[in-house]
Regions:
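Non-catalytic regulatory/interaction regions at protein termini and inter-domain linkers
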Residues: 1-144
Length: 144
């Protein structure tokens, strides 16, 4: 048996969180945020307003240490999400790892737009490949 290769400090990590319902959503997102805060990593939360409110209620005063963005506003123009939300936050913290939760506001989008959303996820991998970022992308399996 061989040991896993060590992770590079500046490695971009992009896990998905597939969830059903509020309990699973909070179980996957809140610890991600708190773990980052515990080790001194800047954290940004860019999710639709309804989910933003859920997480804020769980975080309590920890929310004061998180960059909060409502993706129903910040993500209205998909072409601006990478440069104005994701990359901007990463670039604002050039030394050390940052954490981002980025959830696209899927609800209300027609099925024909799904391929563009999938392409956007792939572009995120390219746009942040040179940054020390852990980006969690939640997907509500009942809506996607």
């Amino acid at each position: 048996m061989t040991a896993p290769a060590p992770r590079l400090v500046d490695e971009f990590v992009h896990p998905a969180l597939f969830y059903r319902g509020t309990a699973e959503y909070l179980k996957g997102t809140v610890p991600f945020i708190r773990d980052g805060l515990a080790v001194g990593e800047p954290v940004a939360l860019a999710v639709p307003g309804s989910n933003l409110r859920l997480i804020l209620a769980e975080l309590g005063t920890d929310a004061e240490r998180v960059r909060l963005l409502d993706m129903t506003r910040s993500g209205r123009s998909p072409g601006r999400i990478i440069p104005n939300v994701l990359r901007a936050f990463a670039d604002a913290h050039p030394s050390g790892r940052v954490r981002i939760i980025g959830e696209h506001p899927w609800s209300g989008h027609p099925a024909r737009e799904y391929p563009a959303c999938a392409q956007h996820e792939t572009l995120i991998n390219v746009a942040l490949a040179d940054r020390s970022v852990t980006m969690l992308c939640p997907y509500d399996v009942d809506r996607v």
